[in-house]
C-alpha cells in the first residue's frame, strides 16, 4: 500500500501495489501529484519514511523533475510522520479490517469507495469535524 496525505487538508490518495520499489513509488508519486493538482493542490514537499525506494537517486530525481522537495523522517521516530501513521490506523480500521471480504480482490476493489467516503463524507476531528475535501478551496465549481 502506498499512501499520500495532504498536510493541510488531510485528503488521502492511496494505491495498492505488491512491491515497494523506487519505480513503483515514483509512479505513485506522479499519479498522486496529478490527482492533487486536479483538485487545485500544488505539491511542494513530500515527507517519506526511510524505505530504500525513498533513499534512491531515482526518487530524488523524480522529485526534482516534479519541482518537489523530498524530506525523510528521522529513523525510528514514527511521530515525525504522525498524520500518515494515524491515517494508516484509520485505513486499517475503516477499510482493511472493517468487514470480512470474500477475497483479497474484493478487499482491493473496496478501497476507492472507502477513500471517497473518507475524503468527502467522514468528519475529521483534527480539522473541525469536517470532511478533508472541504479544506480544498480551489475546487472547480465550488462557489457556483
Model-based region annotation:
Residues 45-50, 65-83, 100-102:
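RNase H-like polynucleotidyl transferase catalytic core
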Residues 15-39:
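Active-site beta-loop-alpha junctions of metal-dependent nucleic acid enzymes
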Residues 59-60:
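Distinct, well-ordered alpha-helical segments
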Residues 20, 38-56, 76, 130-133:
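Acidic/histidine-rich, metal-coordinating catalytic segments
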Residues 6-7:
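Short, acidic, Ser/Thr-enriched surface-loop or helix-capping motifs
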Amino acid at each position: 500500500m502506498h499512501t499520500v496525505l495532504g498536510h493541510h487538508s488531510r485528503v488521502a490518495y492511496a494505491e495498492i501495489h505488491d512491491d515497494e520499489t523506487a519505480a513503483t513509488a515514483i509512479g505513485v508519486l506522479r499519479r498522486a501529484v496529478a490527482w492533487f493538482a486536479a483538485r487545485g493542490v500544488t505539491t511542494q514537499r513530500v515527507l517519506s519514511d526511510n524505505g530504500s525506494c525513498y533513499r534512491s537517486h531515482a526518487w530524488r530525481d523524480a522529485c526534482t523533475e516534479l519541482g518537489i522537495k523530498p524530506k525523510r523522517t528521522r529513523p525510528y521516530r514514527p511521530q515525525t510522520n504522525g498524520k500518515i501513521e494515524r491515517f494508516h490506523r484509520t485505513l486499517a480500521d475503516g477499510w482493511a479490517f472493517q468487514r470480512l471480504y470474500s477475497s483479497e480482490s474484493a478487499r482491493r476493489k473496496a478501497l476507492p469507495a472507502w477513500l471517497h467516503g473518507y475524503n468527502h463524507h467522514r468528519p475529521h476531528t483534527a480539522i473541525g469535524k469536517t470532511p478533508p475535501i472541504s479544506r480544498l478551496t480551489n475546487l472547480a465549481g465550488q462557489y457556483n
